[in-house]
């Protein structure tokens, strides 16, 4: 996790283990670590909530604790309630999703040097007005052996503003 800002690291992109749930209507910045109340964690009672941004420097990077390269088979993803509420209703920072809205999560693998990319895998989490609201498996095996995984977003122009990506990046 990027800890360049000390205790504010999560603000700058990062990951947090959570077990919070809320309704989509309650999805605000106060419930940013929540998934829908009717959706259980995929396995166990906790899940990892990742926060990032469309710019390169705020993207969270997950490193393997042992410092060795590994081949990741894949992972399960879903959207958080903050993202889902904004896509359905908009907020002060972002308009609600429309038919042309496209948002994908981009997973990028890196070799031990931290700069050599092994490739990317994209998964669409918002297609027009349709939001991902269930757990979906993302196959990451094509990234090969990686020492770290960067998680970022790619979005259509209607989700960007003067300062970049405006939708919640959770």
Regions inferred by a protein language model and the residue ranges of each:
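N-terminal targeting leaders for non-cytosolic proteins
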Residues: 1-61, 67
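Intrinsically disordered regions, especially transient/low-confidence alpha-helical propensity segments
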Residues: 5-8, 73, 132
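Short, surface-exposed loop and linker segments with low hydrophobicity and enrichment for Pro/Ser/Thr
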Residues: 35-45, 97-100, 140-146
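A structure-centric signal for secondary-structure junctions around beta-strands
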Residues: 43-46, 69-72, 102-104
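Secretory/extracellular carbohydrate-interaction modules
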Residues: 53, 73, 77-89
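Extended extracellular/luminal ectodomain segments enriched in beta-structured repeat modules
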Residues: 67-74, 145-146
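Short coil-to-beta strand junction motifs in C2/discoidin
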Residues: 86-105
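Terminal, low-complexity interaction segments
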Residues: 104-170
């Amino acid at each position: 996790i990027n800890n360049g800002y000390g205790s504010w690291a999560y603000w700058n992109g990062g990951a947090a283990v959570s077990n919070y749930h809320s309704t989509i209507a309650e999805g605000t910045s106060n419930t940013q670590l929540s998934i829908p109340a009717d959706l259980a964690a995929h396995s166990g009672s906790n899940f990892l909530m990742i926060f990032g941004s469309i710019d390169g420097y705020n993207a969270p990077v997950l490193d393997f604790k042992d410092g060795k390269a590994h081949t990741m088979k894949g992972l399960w993803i879903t959207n958080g309630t903050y993202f889902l509420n904004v896509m359905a209703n908009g907020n002060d920072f972002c308009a609600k999703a429309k038919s042309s809205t496209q948002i994908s999560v981009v997973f990028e693998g890196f070799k031990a040097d931290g700069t050599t990319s092994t490739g990317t895998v994209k998964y669409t989490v918002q297609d027009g007005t349709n939001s991902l609201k269930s757990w979906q498996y993302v196959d990451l095996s094509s990234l090969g052996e990686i020492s770290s995984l960067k998680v970022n977003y790619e979005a259509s122009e209607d989700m960007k503003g003067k300062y970049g990506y405006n939708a919640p990046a959770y």
